[in-house]
Amino acid sequence: MAKRHYIPITADVPGVNEGQRAFIRKVIRTALAAEGVDFPCEVDVLLTNDEAIHQINLDMREVDRATDVLSFPEFDLQPGELPGEEDADPGTGLVPLGDMVISMEHVAAQAKEYGHSNRRELAYLVVHSCLLYTSPSPRDTR
């Protein structure tokens, strides 16, 4: 079976266009390929604002502040482990890797702070989130 990832992107903030969605999908596919993910998988993305990510952070992690990106991996992996096709949802044939939530307000603020483009900052946050699905590390460090 050919590798085909499913990457739905929901935006509850204005100004997110199809070009940005395509860019995010490309970054995710590239990061997963670099990590050796060679099976069809699903990654769900929510693009939101500081207020919403603050509430999600509080509800899910009991951290009372906004942040740039949140990652919710589907699997609790050990170093060197990857989920595999045996973990696929029987209904879709896709391995659900997890969810990522990105504050577009933080993207803009951090891009300005670090002196680079919003696009570069968005790519950085997307890759950072993807690595938590494939390279286990402490999940509450960021």
Predicted segments with their positions:
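Active-site His/Glu-centered metal-binding helix of metallohydrolases
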Residues: 122, 126-131
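Single conserved hydrophobic/aromatic residue that forms the stacking wall/gate
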Residues: 133-142
